[in-house]
Amino acid sequence: MAKVHKDVKKIVLAYSGGLDTSIILKWLKNEYGCEVIAFSADLGQGDELAPIRDKAFATGADKVYIDDLKEEFVRDFVFPMFRANAIYEGHYLLGTSIARPLIAKRQMEIAKIEGADAVSHGATGKGNDQVRFELAYYHFDPAITVVVPWREWKLNSRQALVNYAKKNGIPIPVTKKRPWSSDRNMLHISFEGGILEDTWAEPPENMYVLTKAPEKAPNKPQFVEIEFKNGNAVAVDGEKMSPAQLLAHLNYIGGEHGIGRVDLLENRSVGMKSRGVYETPGGTILREAHSAVEQITMDREVMRIRDSLIPEYARQVYSGYWFSPEREMLQTLIDDSQKCVNGVARVKLYKGHCRTVGRKSETNSLFNLDFATFEKDQVFNQADATGFIKINSLRLRIRALMQGKK
């Protein structure tokens, strides 16, 4: 018999159909005895979404929302982040981190539509997602009730969840043979847990979904031209595309060439280290191309200041502060720097490697061959370097003189 929590009447659950949320849906019905609405955001999971509706109803959902948010995801979340060249700890392109604010945003919109007084998610008490979800919830409604089963129940391991699911007849796509969990959207797919908890063990090849093994990728390189306008990718090989279409196209191309695999031991927001394996084919290509166009269009000092902000911007996204005044402030500054980022980058894809081989801008190029050439020129007086170096070395020479007096 359900243990009724009289203060909670209706819950909107962020539901993926995976290990955690499949159990949570049933657990909420059993423990809270209230109406539970399952919400799944279509962020590009592909075939994973097909059984979601039936599975949710079979597990006890009173109502199910499956909303296509792919264009909004790429346009309003991924692209702003890529305008900042955000990368966490030098490797992670923040595919999971950037998805959570949008899921939470839509979840809160549904809660308002349905008159729900609570929301719930499947993030554990050890992870980053609990912070990302809940900071976003409170941005939209400071008084919302958040039900977090991982902080209440005694199912404290993946295997305990599997056993609970079997006991309750819940079909889940995880077995003892492949116990790792995954999270997929248009930007990436992530894997954690299981064999990946052995930091010395190489991830099994059958784990990867989006990318071919680099050694099995085509023996012939592929060249791709990506056009940018105000820092946003707008076309591939001359073909205009919507943000979601463009990223999907680059995902396919990159996946064929084994682009975008990352194996990272990262520092979580709560303080512990955790291993994550990621596939981000399209995002890897996009960031490389974006940086290339910046190289030819962005002023040196503007780039220096912007580059100094990348770690802070990435930390804010990783830690769940998307809807914060500090992230919005940085975004305003970054977007202003992107007004000149108009041009085309040419990248070469070959067996897991993505590198720039050309960049051009018809309207905003700062590259002037007359000044940059190593051949004879008429515009740069090399003797001017003497004064430049003397002025810039003044503090160093003074320091050396003063130390010599000691």
From Swiss-Prot:
Positions with a binding annotation for L-aspartate: T124, N128, D129
GO cellular component annotations of the record: cytoplasm
MF-aspect GO terms: argininosuccinate synthase activity; ATP binding
Subcellular location: Cytoplasm
Enzyme nomenclature, EC number: 6.3.4.5
Enzyme class: ligase
Regions that span the bilayer: none
Family the entry assigns: Belongs to the argininosuccinate synthase family. Type 1 subfamily.
Protein name listed in UniProt: Argininosuccinate synthase
Originating organism: Geobacter metallireducens (strain ATCC 53774 / DSM 7210 / GS-15)
Gene from which this protein is expressed: argG
